[in-house]
C-alpha cells in the first residue's frame, strides 16, 4: 500500500485507532456442503498446523485434539475451551539424548512438534500427549485446563520414538483399582532400534512428576517389559519398521494391529521383493517379560482380489442381528478393519479397498492352535524380523488354555497362516481410510471415512446378509479422513478429522427424508416415521411413540390411503369421497381434509374410513388454470392433534372439454365421451344431441386411414383420393367437406366429396410452391367438414409436391431421382421433366428404366488430392457429372497420371463422385491427367480432368518440441518437404501413435499419446504406402508436478495473478487453470516462465443471482489442465478459496461527484481487501478517470484515488481482477474566472506592492547574508529531524511485526509464586501494613489479661449479634470524624473477626448493601453511582468478601494469565532501555513513562557465576550496555533465581557486581565511583558502556564488601550509592504497592548535583541544543506504544477472556459471583429498576472495578513478586482498559484523547461484548439456593478459620468503641430491639471490663 503523507497532528490517533487490527485465531464456518447440501459444525486451526489425533472424554463429552505444535480442548460443539502450545522448538532428530538434557553438537533448527499419541488417563484425570520433539517425550496435562502436570524427559525411558509420522504410535492403558496403571506403547523406531523398543509396557504413576513415570514395568539385566528390533534385521531390510495402526485391550490381552515390511519371493521367481504385511500382535496384560508375544498375519479377499494393506481398525460388539448371521453372541468383540488392495504400496495405497470383519474369538482360537502345535515341537518360531534364523519350536508337556501367557521358551512366536476376515463392503474408486462402529438397537453400523473426505454410513447387517451403504456425505475438504474418529458422549454425533479440519456430523440425518417410504427405505436403523408428526426421526424423539401405529419402523407400517372415486370432472362439486386408511393411529382428536392449498374441511372418521367432500364450485377455477386435460392434487389428511399433514394420496380433476379431436377425447384415461355431430368432448354423454352421435371407443371415431405416399407434381391438375372410416354425414344446416393444404405457410382450401363413410376425395386442382432449391415438399393435409370440424388423421398422411427439374441440372442426377416421381431427361432442351412435358420425339426422353438409359458427356470438375507419393496407396476423390449410375459402370475404367487407380465402392456416389486407390508409379512417371470411361470407352462416354496429378518425394528435416510429458498431449510439429501429398498420414513415436492434427507442404502437426515409461523414441511417418525415414527422436519425460501455488485465493470474478511452482512445467504448451464450482467448470489461461515457474489468472466463478455476495466459496475441484496430464486436474493439496468480490457504492443518487482540482476521489465500498488469514494481501486495482489512470490507495472500506490533472466531467471506472464497475461521473470544477473590477483592483494593489517591495529590497539586501546562514542551519536541522523521524518509524514498525514467540516460550510452564492465603488477604485488607496486630497474639499486661480477654469475648458476642453490629456500623458512619481510612479499617477488621462465620458475615453484608441501595435511591443520586467508590463500610466489606471467596479461583484459573501478563510486561520493558532516574522506558504502554528520544544501545550476553555456587555452570544473561550497574544486578538475579519467589532472593543492594577479566583480574562495578562523569552539575550514573564491558564477559555477584579498589571512594561513593540508590531499588518493610511509582534512583538534591541516566529530567532547561533537537517531535516515538501493545495483546486478551468467561480452563464460575449478581438483580427488581445499563453498572462496580482492577494494578497482592514503576504504569493502562470495557457509556475519541484510551480503542468494543455476554450467561444460570450458598460459605470458613487472631482484631475494633462510646450507646438505648436484648447494658459491661486498670 502506498505510504500516506505525514500529518503530524493526527499521526498518533490514526495509528492507534486504525493501525492495530485484531487477528482471529480460529474461525467457525460451515464445512463444504455434501451432495445433500448440508453444513456441519467445523473447527479449523492455524493455517500452518495439521491435526494428528483426536480423543473424546466419555464423561464430559469434551474433545481433545492433538495437532502440530498444539493441543486443543474443545467443547462438544467445537468451541475452543483451552489451547496448550507444544512447539515449535529448536531441535535436531540426531540429538540423543535431546538437547534439553545435554548439549548437542548437531545444528539445531526450528522443529515442529507432531502429536503422535493422545490418551485420556481417566483414573488420574489427565491427558497423555506425546510428540515428536526431543526424541518423543510426553506431557501429562490436567484434563480441566491442560495445565502441565508433568513432562518427564531426563531418562531414556522417557523417549518413546523420534519418528515424526503421526500415525506411527499407539498406546493402550490397562487400569487397576489398587495399583498404578500400565501403559502399553507400540511405536515405529525410524531406524533407531538401539534407542527405542518397538513395543513396551510402562508404569503410569499416580504422581505425574514421579521419577518412575514411564519406567518399564519390569527391567533387569536380562529381561524387560519390551521388545526391540534387532539390528540384524536392518541388514536384510534396510528400511524395516513396524507401523502401528490401532490398539485395544480385550479380556486378559492387549492387541495391536500393524503394518510391517518383509521380503517374499513372487510365484515362479527366485528373487525376493519387499512387500507389506498386516499383522495382529497379542500380549498378556500381566506378562512383564513379553513371553506371550504372538503375531498373526491378517487380510481379506473378495472376488479373487486380495486386500492386504491395513488402513484403519476399530473394536466393537457384534449386535444381535449380525451376531445371528455370524453365529456369535451379540456381546462378542468384532474387529472392523479397512484394507486397501495389494501389498506393495504403503505410502500410495491403491484406491480399491474393503471393509472386513474379524471375530476376535476366532483369532484367539487360531493363536491357541499355533501355541499348542509349537509346544508339541512342531515347526519354527516363524518370526523372521525378530529371530533372523529359523528357531525350531521346543516340546513341553503342559496344558494351553485360552488365557495361556507363554513361558521363556517358544517366545516370541509368529503365525505363518493368514487369518482371513469377512469382507462386507468394497470400494473401487474412493479409498476408505478410517472406520468406527457401534451397535444401535441390535443393528451393527460402521462409519467409514474416505480419501476424498467423504463419510460412508454402512449397515453391516443389511438385508439378505449383505452390508448396505445407506448414505454418503461430503464432510471434510480436502480429504483424506484421518484414522481417528470418535463418537460424542451420547453417541448421537461423530467427530471426523482431516489434516486441516475437524467436523461434527450427526450419526443420523433422518430429517432429510420427506416421506415414510424414503425414511424407511433409506436403510438407516436410527430412522423411523413419526406418523402424526409427519417426520422421519429417532423413536425416542417421537411423541407417544409407544402407542399403536404412531411410529412406523418398517415399510409395511407406513400409512396408506385409497380414495373412492379417485377422480372427478372439474364440473362436479361437493362430491362425497371415501378414504380407506391403513396403519393410521387412533384419531379421536379429529382430522381435516385438504386439497393442497384449497380450503380445509372436517373429515368424518368412520372405523378405518374417513369421509370428505370435494371442493366447492367457487374453488374449482383455481384447479383448472393449468394446461392439459387433468390436474393432479394431493388429497391430504391433517391431524387436529398435531396440526401436521400425516397422509396424502393423489386425486385427479379432469377436464374433457380441452380435447378438440375424437381420438384424444376417447383415448383419455378418464370418463370422456365424444359428440361427433357437435364436435365436443364431455364427461356427460347425455349432452350429445343424437344417440348415434356418442363415441366412446377409438375405432368409432371419424378418421383418415394410412395411405402410401401421395405424390403430386406441381402445375398438374389431379384429384387426391383418401381412405377413411366413420365419416359423418353432415346434418341439416351443416356444411360439407373440404381439404386444406398448408403450402409454405399459406393455406389452400379445396372442395372435397364424401363418397361414403369410408372415402373422401379432394377435387381436381393444381398446386405449386416457390423455389427451385426444393425438389420434394411434404405438405400437411387436413380434412374438415362444417367449416372447422377436423377429421382425425392419426397416420399423419401428407401430400408430397415435387418438381423434376429442381436441383437436377444433369442427366445423371435426373435419372437418380425416385422412380415414383416418373422423371426423365429430355435431351433436346437438356432438362429433367415429366414425359408429357418433353417434345413428342420419343428418342429424346431418357428414363432410368429405359434400354438406352446411359447419360453421355461425363465431366470431371475436381480431383483431391492433386499430389501423392510414387509408392501409391493414395485415395483420390474424383467429382463431376454423369459419372455412371452404377458402380460397375466405372469399376475398371479409371487412370490417374497414367497409373491404374482402383475405384472403391464405399466412396462411390452415383453420377457425382468416384474414389479410387492409386497403384505404384514408375520412376519415369511424374504427372498426368485423370481419365475415366463410363461403361464403354467411346468418346461420348469418356472424360479427362483439367487438373494435373503429380507424384512427389516426401522428406523430413526436424521436429519441435523434441520432448514432452509421459501423459502425452504435446503438439509436435514435424518439418520437411511435400508433406501435404497423399491422402492418409500416420505418425509413430516408437510404438506410440502421434495423433494427426493438420499439415501443409512444409510441416505435419500431431498430438502425442501417453507412454508408460520415460525414454527416447524414433519418429516415423507414413503417407499412404510411402514410409519416410529420418533420424528424428522424441523423448518422453516425467509428467509435470505442482509443488506450490501462491496465493491460494482469488475473488469470485477471478483474473487475479497466481504464481505456480513445480517441475517440468516448460513441457506444457497450453497450460490452463481450472476450478469446478456448482457443477460447472471454469477455466483461465496460464503462462509458463521456465521449467519450475508459471503464472496463471484465477478462473472466475459464475454464481447465480440468488448467491449471497458476502460468502466465501470453496470450489469442489481445483487444478490445472496441462495438455494431457490427468493427475493435476484436481489438486488435492491446495485449499483454494474464493473471497467475495469488492463492492463499490455509487456516487449518490445522481451518480455525479463534484470536486475541486487536486481533491482525491474516494470510492466507498466493502470487501476491498480480501479477509485472508494473515491479512497481508492486496488486489491490483486500476482506476480510470476518463482515460487517465490515477494513483490508488486501498483500505478495507474505501479506495482513495489521487485525481489526475483534469477538469470537467469524466466517467470513473474501477477495475480489479475480472470485474469492472463505474460508480458514476466525477465533475472537477475549474477555478472561477475573476470579474473586471476585481482585476483592476488587483492590478492597482499589485503596483503599490511593487513600489513597497523595491523600497524594502534595499533594507533586505543587508540582511541577506545572515539569512542565508540561518537558512542553511535550519535546513540542516530539518534534514537531521527528518532522518530521525524516518528511522524511528521504521524501527517502530519492525518492532510491531516482531513475533512474541520468545515471550511466550519464556513464560510457558514457569512456576507461579502465589502468596499464601494469609499474606494475600492481608495485602488486600490492610495494604501497606506488613506486621498487622491481627497476625499476632494480643499483647496485654499480665494483670489485665484475664479481664481484657473476658471483655473481648463479651464484645465478640455483640459483634455476632446482627442488630448490634448493624447499629454499631451505622453509628460509626454517621460520625463526621469517622474518616474514609477508618471506614476501610473497620470493614477489614470485621471481616477478619467473621472469617470463621462467613454465613453471618454475608447476611450482614447483604443488609448493609440493601441499606446502601435504599439510601442511594432516596438521595436521588444517579443509580449508576452505587458502589462506584469506597465511601462506606459496606463497600469495603464487599471487596473483602470477594477477596476471601475468589482466592481459589485466582490460584486455579485467573492467576495464570495475570502472572503471564505481568511477566510479559516486565520482560518486554527490560528488552529496551529503562531510565533509572525517571523510570521512563523505550517500551511502554503509558505515554507518561515513554522515553521520547532515540537511545543508542546494544544487547550483550554476559556469563554470570552463581552467587550460591561458584562451581555451578555459568548462566547466560541478556543485558543492555546502557543499563546501570544496579539494573544489571537485578537482571542477573532474575536469571539466576528465575523460579524463586522474590522474598527468597538476595537483594541487589546486598550484592556487588564483579567483572572478571581473565588472569585473576577482577573489578567491582558500581553506579557511582571515582570514574563517574560530572558535566555542568549533571552527574551520569555508570553503565556497562561506561566501563566498556564487551559482549561475552564473565561477571559474578558477590556479597557486598569494601575492597582496595573502591576504598578511596568509600567515604563518598559507598554512602551515596548504597543509601541513596541501591536501597531505593529493593528494601523491606512495606509492600511494593507503596513504592511502585517512585523512580528507581533518587537524584542527590542535597549536594546540588543533578543525577541523570539516559534522559535529563524534562524540568531542567539547560539541555544542549542537540538534545532539544532529538525531542523536537517527540510524539513520533508514541508509535512505540503500538509496538508494545501488539506484543502484549495476546496476554491482555487471555486475562480478559479468563475473567469474563463463565467456564474457563476447566474452572466453573465461583458461586460468590453468581450469588452476589442475583442479589443485585433482586434489589433492582425490588426498586423497579429495569434499565439494563443500571444493572450492568451495578455489577461492574461490584466485581470487576472493585476486585479485578485492584488485582490487575497490584499483582503483588497475589504473587510474591517485585513491581517496578514502569511495569506499574503499564498495568495501570491495562486496568484502565479493563474499566472502560465494563462501562456502558460510549467513548468518543479523537486525536486529542489520552493515548491509553486511543491505544485500545479498537479492542474495547469486543471486550464490551465479552462483558455483556458474561453478565448474560451468569443471569441464565440456575439460581443458587441459600442452603447451597451457606454450605459453601461454611466450607470456606472451616478452611481458613485460624488465619487471623480474633482477639487482636476485636481489640482493634474496640478502639472505635472507646472513641465513640456515647454515640454508640445512644441508639442502643433508644432502639426497641436493642432494648429487648439489653445491648447497651452488655456494651457497658464490655467497656467496664476493658477500662479497669486493676
Swiss-Prot record:
Topology feature Extracellular, residues: 24-1237
Ranges for domain PSI: 509-559, 655-702, 803-856
Cellular component annotations (GO), alphabetically ordered: cerebellar climbing fiber to Purkinje cell synapse; plasma membrane; semaphorin receptor complex
Signal sequence coordinates: 1-23
SUPFAM superfamilies referenced in this protein's UniProt entry, alphabetically: E set domains, GTPase activation domain, GAP, Plexin repeat, Sema domain
Glycosylated residue positions: 655, 1007, 1132, 1180
PROSITE patterns for the chain: SEMA (PS51004)
Domain spans labelled Sema: 24-507
Membrane protein topology class: Single-pass type I membrane protein
Subcellular location: Cell membrane
Major site of localization recorded for this protein: membrane
Modified residues (N6-acetyllysine): 1350
One GO process term, biological-process aspect: postganglionic parasympathetic fiber development
Disulphide connectivity of cysteines: 95-104, 130-138, 284-405, 300-356, 374-393, 510-527, 516-558, 519-536, 530-542, 593-612
Keyword Repressor appears in the UniProt entry: no
GO terms for MF: semaphorin receptor activity
Segments forming domain IPT/TIG: 858-952, 954-1037, 1040-1139, 1142-1230
Keywords, comma-separated and alphabetical: Acetylation, Cell membrane, Disulfide bond, Glycoprotein, Membrane, Receptor, Repeat, Signal, Transmembrane, Transmembrane helix
Topological domains, Cytoplasmic: 1259-1894
Function field: Coreceptor for SEMA3A. Necessary for signaling by class 3 semaphorins and subsequent remodeling of the cytoskeleton. Plays a role in axon guidance in the developing nervous system. Class 3 semaphorins bind to a complex composed of a neuropilin and a plexin. The plexin modulates the affinity of the complex for specific semaphorins, and its cytoplasmic domain is required for the activation of down-stream signaling events in the cytoplasm.
Family, per entry: Belongs to the plexin family.
PANTHER family: PLEXIN, PLEXIN-A4
Annotated protein name in UniProt: Plexin-A4
Organism: Homo sapiens
